[in-house]
């Protein structure tokens, strides 16, 4: 690893002088991922009710799509960006990197359980074309004290990129992502591991053909492959293509848009079609009151005709307080790729249906002097086909939990607060409670505490997660999850990081259960080096 660091540092010294002195763009529209940039907060991850334990195995480079009906725990309110940070750039990016048209970030790490981690990203933030290119590789083998090669492993590889430029007045936005995740099945069932590959290309054109008017079109694709490895491997293939056309008019006080979309999906050769036609609007009644809405028609081969709509009202009586109320009838299109990544220990339902139903949300936010923020809210929803693991039917033919789509109601309240007096210093807390029947392996109460402090060259951070209120008929590990870490700023370009995760699991007297009998990695330590060039 030392040799790699030396090579990367040498490459940074070889950058042309012109690349070091260019001015930063006013409004860069390629956002840099904070998973690379904010190492002092790297262990902080958003809790979700969709796939408990998924976030504990590998820190995801990007947020995974949530299955229908599973609302997230309110993320801690983000610290307001420092005054010197241009809009659109994360506060963790060093000032010298923001002033260069080309920036590179690299992160290398290794730790217990044969943990290897590498992430490299390039960003073109100057004149067009603007671009982003990122590669990630991470592996764990021998989780929870098991022998390496025994099926207690996890590997994730990602390659993604984006390109933005103009052809005359037409804005062009191209992006693509390739992801591969292999998870050992821990000796359950006839297979060794489950391999998931996804490829998601997309292209969008936007033409402002007249003042206030914009015509846009996009073409998105999605390709997902699942492979159960073993002496008799089994596979599944899903392919989807979706064109869309939209027209929008924006005035100083309101905007109005219409769009149409078609999607064709092939799941192991079986075709299904979806089509939507909808309109949306937004009105600023004053600086303090904004109303937005949408509505239209949705048709699917399996769902038939549906008529979703949504209304939201935001009231901001003063800069410190805002209230958001929303509700309507929504349709959530679920695909194999979404479900495979969100439910790692479950088999796909057959067929995969759209989930639809009524919902209402209410959220209030209070902030004070840009250092303190408090957020609280409630969610209520009804679902016609929400995914839910069936514990009574475990194990399925492949040693996994059958996943069925059921009718269910969901209700939850949540709150979070954050105090951030300085850039590297913060304290936050998040709480969520389920008020209605919730899926197995989803806690009834979630509590998370996070904190960190930074000085000129040193910093520490930690997190504590407490999950309670599980179904007593299932086996769980109730021991809180404690993680600690720290960093040393060796130079302007290099930061060294040490992390220790799940330090309290030895008190449980056994491995930490994810979806019983599947286990999580458990106590582990990692050393990393982050380099900004």
Question: Model-predicted segments: where are they?
Answer:
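Outer-membrane beta-barrel translocator/receptor signature
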Residues: 87-88, 97-159, 168-170, 180-182
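Residues that define the transmembrane beta-barrel architecture of outer-membrane proteins
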Residues: 100-102, 114-118, 153-159, 193-201, ...
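Transmembrane beta-strands of outer-membrane beta-barrel pores
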Residues: 108-112, 126, 137-141, 167-169, ...
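Residues on the lipid-exposed face of transmembrane beta-strands in outer-membrane beta-barrel proteins
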Residues: 120-124, 161-165, 201-207, 239-249, ...
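Repeated loop/turn-to-beta-strand initiation elements of outer-membrane beta-barrel proteins
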Residues: 128-132, 169-174, 210-217, 250-258, ...
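Flexible loop and strand-edge segments within Gram-negative outer membrane beta-barrel domains
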Residues: 141-158, 175-210, 220-240, 269-270
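Outer membrane beta-barrel strand-and-loop segments of large Gram-negative receptors
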Residues: 349-353, 359-365, 373-430, 446-448
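Outer-membrane beta-barrel "beta-signal"
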Residues: 494-495, 519-533
């Amino acid at each position: 690893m030392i040799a790699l660091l030396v090579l990367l540092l040498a490459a940074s010294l070889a950058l042309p002088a012109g690349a070091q002195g260019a001015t930063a763009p006013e409004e860069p529209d390629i956002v840099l991922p904070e998973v690379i940039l904010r190492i002092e907060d790297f262990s902080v991850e958003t809790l979700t009710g969709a796939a408990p334990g998924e976030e504990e195995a590998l820190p995801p480079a990007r947020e995974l799509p949530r299955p229908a009906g599973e609302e997230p725990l309110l993320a801690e309110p983000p610290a307001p960006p420092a005054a010197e940070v241009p809009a659109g750039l994360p506060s963790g990016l060093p000032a010298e990197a923001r002033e260069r048209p080309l920036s590179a970030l690299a992160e290398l790490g290794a730790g217990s359980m044969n943990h290897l981690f590498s992430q490299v990203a390039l960003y073109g933030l100057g004149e067009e074309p603007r671009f982003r290119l990122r590669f990630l590789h991470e592996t764990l083998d021998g989780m929870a004290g098991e022998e390496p090669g025994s099926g207690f492993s996890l590997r994730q590889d990602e390659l993604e990129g984006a390109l933005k430029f103009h052809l005359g007045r037409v804005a062009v936005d191209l992006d693509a992502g390739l992801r591969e995740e292999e998870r050992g099945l821990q000796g359950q069932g006839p297979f060794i591991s489950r391999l998931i590959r996804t490829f998601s290309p997309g292209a969008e054109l936007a033409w402002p053909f007249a003042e206030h008017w914009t015509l846009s079109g996009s073409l998105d694709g999605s390709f997902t492959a699942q492979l159960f490895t073993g002496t008799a491997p089994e596979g599944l293939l899903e392919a989807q293509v979706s064109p869309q056309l939209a027209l929008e008019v924006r005035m100083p006080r309101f905007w109005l848009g219409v769009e149409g979309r078609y999607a064709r999906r092939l799941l192991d050769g079986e075709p299904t079609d979806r089509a939507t036609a909808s309109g949306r609007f937004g009105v600023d009644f004053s600086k303090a009151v904004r109303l937005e809405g949408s509505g239209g028609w949705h048709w699917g081969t399996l769902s038939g005709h549906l008529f979703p709509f949504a209304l939201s009202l935001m009231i901001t009586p003063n800069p410190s307080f805002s209230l958001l109320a929303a509700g309507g009838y929504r349709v959530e299109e679920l695909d194999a790729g979404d479900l495979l990544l969100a439910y790692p220990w479950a088999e796909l339902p057959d067929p995969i249906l759209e989930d639809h139903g009524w919902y209402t949300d209410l959220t209030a936010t209070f902030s004070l002097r840009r250092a303190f923020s408090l957020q609280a809210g409630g969610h209520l929803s009804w679902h016609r086909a929400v995914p839910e693991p069936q514990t009574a039917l475990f194990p399925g033919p492949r040693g996994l939990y059958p996943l069925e789509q059921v009718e269910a109601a969901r209700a939850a309240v949540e709150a979070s607060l954050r105090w951030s007096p300085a850039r590297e210093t913060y304290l936050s807390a998040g709480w969520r409670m389920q008020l209605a029947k919730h899926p197995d392996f989803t806690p009834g109460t979630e509590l998370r505490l996070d904190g960190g402090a930074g000085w000129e060259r040193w910093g520490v951070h930690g997190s504590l997660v407490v999950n309670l209120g599980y179904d007593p008929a299932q086996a769980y590990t109730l021991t809180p999850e404690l993680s600690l870490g720290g960093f040393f700023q060796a130079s302007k370009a290099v930061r060294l990081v040490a992390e220790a995760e799940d330090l309290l699991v030895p008190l449980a007297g056994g491995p930490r259960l994810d979806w019983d009998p599947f286990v999580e990695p458990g106590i582990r330590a990692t050393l990393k080096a982050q380099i900004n060039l």
